[in-house]
A protein has these predicted regions:
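Structured alpha-helical segments in the cores of large, soluble enzyme domains
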Residues: 112-113
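Globin-like tetrapyrrole-binding proteins
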Residues: 108
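Oxyanion-binding/catalytic loops of NTP- or PPi-dependent enzymes
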Residues: 1-73, 82, 93-94, 98, ...
């Protein structure tokens, strides 16, 4: 049948994993630089496309040919114009030259696929809150990369990895807190050994590390303007500032303050950014995270005391404020010790094994023999109908829900409608 791999197709970083000969998920490194995670940046050159850190480097000098965060555009009907260096809405426009999101995403998938050999199938992860249009575009990207693909939600993949760790103590109802570079998901699941039953998922498809970087850039811009009398030029379009902001954010996870020399229109200037300043700047996002935590608990009919463990996923969970939020609401610290950048890819590899049992050796089959996953529908699914209010003798179009959110999958629900 051929090998099946697991791919975490992230907003800012991506990763690929496969089962080793003993059935344990193994993250594959980029053969060019040995990196276990690959930056989801694409540079469109005259002769070929470049993916990864080299593409990000190119963004500093050639932004128009460098595409970042393509994942955030997957559900949109847009084209990246290398002439204008931005996404352009296709609606009402003809003959726009450029690249649609699925084409750019396929370049990343092709790069990752080459880390292994003989790969024709893959399990690709998507945010739990990804719209159907975005899921369809991801499938299109896989086809362009010559991959037969099945999708799995990112937090669901992550809990599979946690539950299948050697000697895992993960059990009972758990909360998966997945804060990455561009999206945020919370999933509550029941874990019994290697059996995972998803209960509910909530999230925000536009909340993640890139938004935090923007706030750091705003801090830098204000301080530069105060010191020099003139602000930076289009700071949120300057990729070199995002590189600096990302570095500041990472350092502030371990230190209270960091200094950087910022080049601007009035010359260089040393700027200090404190952890307190940074955390205050993202207060709106912090409140949204708290709200979604409360929503997940309410939807699952759980109190914090009913949750045995909170599991971290995604690079942005390294920020100290994340631990503070979880401690305050969940009344206990989150579980640490797993590589939060790789957990989703590893879970995808485990799920890939479930989809390819015929292609596994005896040790691999034994390793995943007790793995079981039961997921839910993350969205209300229905159809647009014309309904009549008999009391008011009025009619109108409404969205009639056929499958409620959090319905266990697979499911089959039948409703009868009359055609007018």
């Amino acid at each position: 049948m051929g090998k099946i791999i697991g791919i975490d197709l992230g907003t800012t970083f991506s990763a690929i994993a496969e089962l080793d000969d003993l059935g344990n998920p193994e993250v594959l490194s980029d053969p060019e630089n040995n990196n276990r995670i690959t930056r989801s940046a694409v540079y469109i050159g005259r002769d070929k496309a470049i993916v990864g850190d080299k593409a990000l480097d190119a963004a500093v000098t050639n932004r128009k040919n460098t595409i970042l965060e393509v994942k955030s555009q997957m559900e949109n009907d847009v084209v990246w114009s290398t002439k204008e260096g931005k996404w352009i809405d296709k609606e009402g426009k003809k003959d726009i030259k450029g690249y649609v999101p699925s084409q750019i995403s396929s370049i990343i998938l092709s790069k990752l696929k080459d880390y292994s050999s003989g790969v024709k199938k893959a399990v690709v992860t998507v945010p739990a809150m990804f719209a159907q249009a975005a899921r369809d575009a991801t499938m299109d990207a896989a086809k362009l990369a010559k991959l037969d693909v099945e999708l799995i939600n990112e937090p669901t993949a992550a809990v599979l990895h946690y539950a299948n760790l050697p000697g895992s103590s993960i059990n009972g109802r758990v909360l998966i807190f997945d804060l990455g570079g561009g999206t945020f998901d919370i999933t509550i699941a029941a874990v019994n050994g290697k059996k995972v039953d998803v209960i509910t998922s909530v999230g925000d498809k536009n909340l993640g590390g890139r938004r935090f970087d923007e706030e750091i850039i705003n801090i830098i811009d204000k301080k530069y303007k105060k010191a020099k009398g003139k602000g930076l030029e289009n700071p949120l379009e300057d990729e070199s500032l995002f590189v600096i902001a990302e570095r500041i954010k990472k350092i502030l996870s371990n230190k209270d303050k960091v200094s950087e020399i910022i080049e601007g229109p009035k010359g260089p200037h040393k700027i200090d950014v404190s952890r307190t300043e940074f955390e205050n700047s993202i207060d709106t996002y912090v409140e949204k995270i708290k709200m979604l935590l409360e929503q997940a608990l309410e939807e699952s009919k759980c109190k914090p005391s009913n949750i045995s463990q909170t599991l971290l996923v995604g690079g942005s969970t390294r920020m100290p404020i994340v631990t503070e939020i979880i401690k305050k609401i969940m009344k206990k610290a989150p579980v640490k010790g797993v590589n939060v950048d790789e957990a989703v890819a590893c879970g995808a590899a485990i799920y890939a094994g479930l989809q390819n049992k015929e292609g596994l050796n005896s040790a691999q089959k034994k390793a995943i023999s007790k793995v079981e996953l039961n997921d839910v529908c993350n969205f209300y699914m229905g159809t647009l109908i014309y309904a009549v209010d008999q009391e008011r003798n009025q009619g109108g179009m409404i969205n009639d829900i056929v499958i409620p959110r959090n319905t266990k999958l697979p499911c089959s629900i039948t409703k009868d409608y009359r055609v007018m």
